Regions:
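Short beta->alpha linker loops
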Residues: 14, 130-133
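Structural signature of beta-strand start/N-cap positions in the alpha/beta core
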Residues: 66, 125-126
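Flexible, glycine- and charge-enriched loops at secondary-structure boundaries
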Residues: 12, 105, 163
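Acetyl-CoA-dependent GNAT
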Residues: 4-94, 99-100, 112-114, 118, ...
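C-terminal "cap" of GNAT-fold acetyltransferases
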Residues: 2-6, 125, 132-174
């Protein structure tokens, strides 16, 4: 396969601004999907979910976290991250998203593989993640590396904004 993209870690004061457009695209897609599924105009009318979503970016950039992007030429076409959790052995994978125009090229798998390797290097022994129930392709990707369904976990983003019932929770030992 001819790979025309690369995975790189972001850090520093400008990292959040670099990924903000892709994070915005991902959040807008999720919220639009929920609104359509529920027949609602908005599922986040007061912006609670949006504020929580963007506040997490600093946890990806802090100690024990990681923020990766996939670039095709100079365009960021994918993103993935992990953050530390309530215990020192567990990381939570977050914000795995590949733009529709770049899907099917192996970017999501490359991002996930790098996140898992980096989490191991940080000393984590397991990763957890939450994904919306409608994201069946994501479920298949995570299950292909051995992730298994678990009960909802404390501190989950979806649980904190009332979407636990529309979320699949997964865990993978490293």
């Amino acid at each position: 396969m001819n790979v025309s993209w690369r995975i790189e870690a972001l850090s520093g004061p400008d990292a959040a601004a670099v990924v903000e457009p892709l994070f915005r695209e991902y959040l807008d897609w999720i919220l639009a999907r929920f609104a359509a599924d529920l027949g609602a105009e908005s599922v986040d009318p007061d912006g609670t979910a949006e504020r929580a979503y963007f506040a997490e970016t600093q946890r990806f950039l802090g100690p024990g976290g990681r923020l990766l992007v996939a670039r095709r030429d100079d365009e960021i076409v994918g993103v993935g991250a992990f953050k530390p959790t309530y215990d020192e052995r567990t990381a939570e994978i977050k914000r795995m998203f590949v733009r529709p125009s770049a899907r099917g090229s192996g970017i999501a798998r490359a991002l996930l593989d790098r996140l898992l390797n980096d989490a191991r290097s940080e000393g984590y022994t397991r990763v957890r993640l939450e994904t919306m129930s409608f994201m069946t392709e994501a479920h298949a990707l995570y299950q292909s590396v051995g992730a298994r369904a678990i009960d909802p976990f404390d501190g989950s983003e979806a649980g904190n904004v009332g979407l636990a019932g529309a979320t699949t929770y997964l865990e993978l030992p490293l």
